[in-house]
Amino acid sequence: MEIEKTNRMNTLFEFYATLLTDKQMNYIELYYADDYSLAEIAEEFNISRQAVYDNIKRTEKVLESYEEKLHLFSNYVVRNQLLEELMKKYSTDQYLITKLQEIQQIDEEEF
């Protein structure tokens, strides 16, 4: 499994988990976050490996679809980049730095 894909799926899961069904959440979390194999998940839920595989693939598409429509992850990345740039450019303005850090903290608390 590619590390980049794993990281992306874990991140998309963090942003959109509440939009998934319980079954989708369980399979994705076990597969990507907990590094279970398809066989281990299948055994855990007493279903076939193929059923687990199909569900995970469908859920990956669902997560990508949510990101395509809502842009929560990509907007989060852009916001953080902009905040970092502002902190560097105005590093001597303590009031501004404090306010930027507050914004950053709010963003991080949400996810």
Curated annotation (Swiss-Prot):
SUPFAM superfamilies assigned to the protein according to its UniProt record, in alphabetical order: Sigma3 and sigma4 domains of RNA polymerase sigma factors
Bilayer-spanning residue ranges: none
InterPro entries membership: RNA_pol_sigma_r3/r4-like (IPR013324), UPF0122 (IPR007394), UPF0122_fam_protein (IPR054831), WH-like_DNA-bd_sf (IPR036388)
One Pfam entry name: UPF0122
Primary role: Might take part in the signal recognition particle (SRP) pathway. This is inferred from the conservation of its genetic proximity to ftsY/ffh. May be a regulatory protein.
Family: Belongs to the UPF0122 family.
Record-linked PANTHER family: UPF0122 PROTEIN CBO2450/CLC_2298, UPF0122 PROTEIN YLXM
Protein name: UPF0122 protein YofM
Organism: Lactococcus lactis subsp. lactis (strain IL1403)
